UniProtKB/Swiss-Prot annotation:
This is Sesquiterpene synthase 12. It comes from Solanum habrochaites. Belongs to the terpene synthase family. Tpsa subfamily. The lineage of its organism: Eukaryota, Viridiplantae, Streptophyta, Embryophyta, Tracheophyta. The gene is TPS12. The Asp-Asp-Xaa-Xaa-Asp/Glu (DDXXD/E) motif is important for the catalytic activity, presumably through binding to Mg(2+). Keywords: Lyase, Magnesium, Metal-binding. A motif (DDXXD motif) lies at residues 296-300. Binds 3 Mg(2+) or Mn(2+) ions per subunit. Pathway: Secondary metabolite biosynthesis; terpenoid biosynthesis. Mg(2+) 3 binds at residues 441, 449.
Length: 545
C-alpha cells in the first residue's frame, strides 16, 4: 500500500537561483526612424537582387543560402519560395552538375523548403560499392556542403547515412589544419549542423564567419548587422514587458522552490520564432511556458501527493469556482494560470480567433495530467512503470505537445480548425519532437534527479525492463533522437494533409531549442554557464556595425 504523502518530506530539488532577476526591466530601447529607413533601403536592394538573379545559377543558390544563414530571409519569404520552386522544377529536367558543393547546396535548400528531392543526385560521387570517392576528400567546401545536406535525410536513405559518416570522418581529421575562418565554420558545423541550429543563434555566429570571408558582400553584411540589432531592440522591449508581468506576479518570493527562469523561457520561445510578426505570440507563449515550468517543479519537486490531487482536479475543471479546493499556497498560481488564458481569449476575440484558446487549454490540462501521473507512480511506493507506459506519458510531460499547439494561438496567420485538430492528435512530427525532447532531457538530467526522491526516469525503466546497462540505454536513446530528426524531415515533404509550412517550422524550432540546451547537460536548470552566454549574445550585446 502506498505511503501517505503526509508522512513524506517534500522532495526539494534546491534549484539554483535566477541569473537575471529583473535585469531586463529597464531595457526600453527605441528603434530610430534612421535605423528603419536604412534597413528598408537595403531590403529593397536585396529583394531586387533575388528577383533578378537567374534561378538556375550558382549565384542564386549562394545568395539564398547566405541570406538565410545571416537571418534576414524572413524579409523575402515569397521571393525565396518562388525561386526554390523554380530551382526544384529545373533540377528534374537537368541534373548534370558534377560539383559536389553545388549539388549538395541545391539539395539542402530544396529539402529545407519542403520539397522532396531524391538523394540519388549523390550517386555520381560514389564508387560501385556505394562508398564516396576518396578524391572528394580534397574538396573541403564540397565535404562541408555534403555534411550539411546529409542532415536532411529520412529513414533508410543509405547514401545519406554514408555521406554523414564519410564527411564527419574527413572533416574531423582536417579541421585542425584549416585556415582560421574555415576552421571556425567547420567546427561550428560539426558541433551544430545548420538543420539543428537555432536560426537566431546561427545568424549571429554566421555574421562573424561571413565578415571574415574575403569575398563577402559588404552591403549584405551591413544589412544583416543592422537587422540583427533592430530585432534585438524589439526582443529587449518584449522581455522588459514580460519581466514587469513576472515581477508583479511575485512568484520568485511566493514559490522559492521553483526555477525562476523567465528570461530563459523567453529565450526558449525566441528560438521558436524570432520574427517581428510573432511578437504577440512570443509574449503569450513565454507566459505559458514559464507556468508549465512552475507546474513541473511543483509536481516533481515540492508538493505532496495530497496537495497535488485537488490541484490537478482544479486545473482539469478550469473554473475559478474550483479555487477553494486548491491548497491555499497554490491558489495564487491557479489564479495566474486562469488569467493568462483569459487574457489570451480577450485579445484574440478582437480578431474572432478566441476559439484557438480551447486547444491551448486542452494541451495544458493534458500536460498537467502527465505530471500528475508521474506523481502517482512516485506515491505508489515509488512504482516503476513499464517502459512503454512511461514513454507514452513522458512524451506528453516533455511539454512539447503543449508547446507545438499553444505557440500557434497568438500568431496572425490563418490557421484552420483542421490544423489545430491535426496537431492535438499527435502527428508524427509532434511525437518525434516530443521524443527528442524527452530523450535528451533524460540523458542530461536523470542522474541528478535520482539524487533526491524522484520517480524512475525513462532510462531507469528501460534498463530494468530490458536488462541493459546505462551505457546501452544511452545508445538506444541517442538512436531514438537520430530517428526523431529523420521523422521530422520526412514530415516536411511527405505529409498527406495540407498543413502550413510555418506550423511545421515551429515544431522544428522547438526541437532545435532542446538540441541546443540539452546537448551536453540540462542548461535550463543549470543556467549560469553556456545558457547565460547565449542570452548575452542574443539579448544583451549588439553587433558592431
Amino acid at each position: 500500500m502506498a505511503a501517505s504523502s503526509a508522512d513524506k518530506s517534500r522532495p526539494l530539488a534546491n534549484f539554483s537561483p535566477t541569473v537575471w532577476g529583473y535585469h531586463f526591466l529597464s531595457y526600453t530601447p527605441e528603434i530610430s526612424s534612421q535605423e528603419k529607413h536604412e534597413v528598408d533601403e537595403l531590403k529593397e536592394i536585396f529583394r531586387k537582387m533575388l528577383v533578378e538573379t537567374c534561378d538556375n545559377s550558382t549565384q542564386k543558390l549562394v545568395l539564398i543560402d547566405t541570406i538565410q544563414r545571416l537571418g534576414v530571409a524572413y524579409h523575402f519569404d515569397n521571393e525565396i519560395e518562388t525561386s526554390i520552386q523554380n530551382i526544384f522544377d529545373a533540377s528534374k529536367q537537368n541534373d548534370n552538375d558534377d560539383n559536389l558543393h553545388i549539388v549538395s547546396l541545391r539539395f539542402r535548400l530544396v529539402r529545407q523548403q519542403g520539397h522532396y528531392m531524391s538523394s540519388d543526385v549523390f550517386k555520381q560521387f560514389t564508387n560501385q560499392d556505394g562508398k564516396f570517392k576518396e578524391t572528394l576528400t580534397n574538396d573541403v567546401q564540397g565535404l562541408l556542403s555534403l555534411y550539411e545536406a546529409s542532415h536532411l535525410r529520412v529513414r533508410d536513405e543509405e547514401i545519406l547515412e554514408e555521406a554523414l559518416t564519410f564527411t564527419t570522418t574527413h572533416l574531423e581529421s582536417i579541421v585542425s589544419n584549416l585556415s582560421n575562418n574555415n576552421k571556425v565554420e567547420v567546427s561550428e558545423a560539426l558541433t551544430q549542423p545548420i538543420r539543428m541550429t537555432l536560426p537566431r543563434m546561427g545568424a549571429r555566429k554566421y555574421i562573424s564567419i561571413y565578415e571574415n570571408n574575403d569575398a563577402h558582400n559588404h552591403l549584405l553584411l551591413k544589412f544583416a548587422k543592422l537587422d540583427f540589432n533592430m530585432l534585438q531592440k524589439l526582443h529587449q522591449r518584449e522581455l522588459s514587458d514580460l519581466t514587469r508581468w513576472w515581477k508583479d506576479l511575485d512568484f520568485a518570493n511566493k514559490y522559492p522552490y521553483a526555477r525562476d527562469r523567465l528570461v530563459e523561457c523567453y529565450f526558449w520561445i525566441l528560438g521558436v520564432y524570432f520574427e517581428p510578426k510573432y511578437s504577440r505570440a512570443r509574449k503569450m507563449m513565454t507566459k505559458v511556458i514559464q507556468m508549465a515550468s512552475f507546474f513541473d517543479d511543483t509536481f516533481d519537486a515540492y508538493a505532496t501527493f495530497d496537495e497535488l490531487e485537488p490541484f490537478n482536479d482544479a486545473i482539469q475543471r478550469w473554473d475559478i469556482n474550483a479555487i477553494d479546493s486548491v491548497p491555499p499556497y497554490l491558489r495564487h498560481a491557479y489564479q495566474a494560470l486562469l488569467d493568462i488564458y483569459s487574457e489570451m481569449e480577450q485579445e484574440l476575440a478582437k480578431e474572432f480567433k478566441s476559439d484557438r484558446v480551447y486547444y491551448a487549454k486542452y494541451e495544458m490540462k493534458k500536460l498537467v495530467r502527465a505530471y500528475f501521473k508521474e506523481a502517482q507512480w512516485l506515491n505508489d511506493d515509488n512504482h516503476i512503470p513499464k517502459y512503454e507506459e512511461h514513454m507514452e506519458n513522458a512524451m506528453v510531460s516533455a511539454g512539447y505537445m503543449m508547446g507545438a499547439t499553444t505557440c500557434l494561438v497568438g500568431v496572425d496567420e490563418f490557421i484552420s480548425q483542421e490544423t489545430f485538430e491535426w496537431i492535438i492528435n499527435e502527428p508524427l512530427i509532434v511525437r518525434a519532437s516530443s521524443l527528442i525532447a524527452r530523450a535528451m532531457d533524460d540523458i542530461a538530467g536523470h542522474e541528478v534527479e535520482q539524487q533526491r526522491e524522484h520517480g524512475a526516469s525513462l532510462i531507469e525503466c528501460y534498463m530494468k525492463d530490458y536488462g541493459v546497462s546505462k551505457q546501452e540505454a544511452y545508445v538506444k536513446f541517442q538512436k531514438e533522437v537520430t530517428n526523431g530528426w529523420m521523422d521530422i524531415n520526412k514530415e516536411f515533404f511527405c505529409l498527406d494533409v495540407q498543413v502550413p509550412k510555418f506550423v511545421l517550422e515551429r515544431v522544428l524550432n522547438f526541437t532545435r531549442v532542446i538540441n541546443t540546451l540539452y546537448k551536453e547537460k540540462d542548461e535550463y536548470t543549470n543556467s549560469k554557464g553556456k545558457f547565460k552566454n547565449m542570452i548575452i549574445t542574443l539579448l544583451v550585446e549588439s553587433v558592431e556595425i
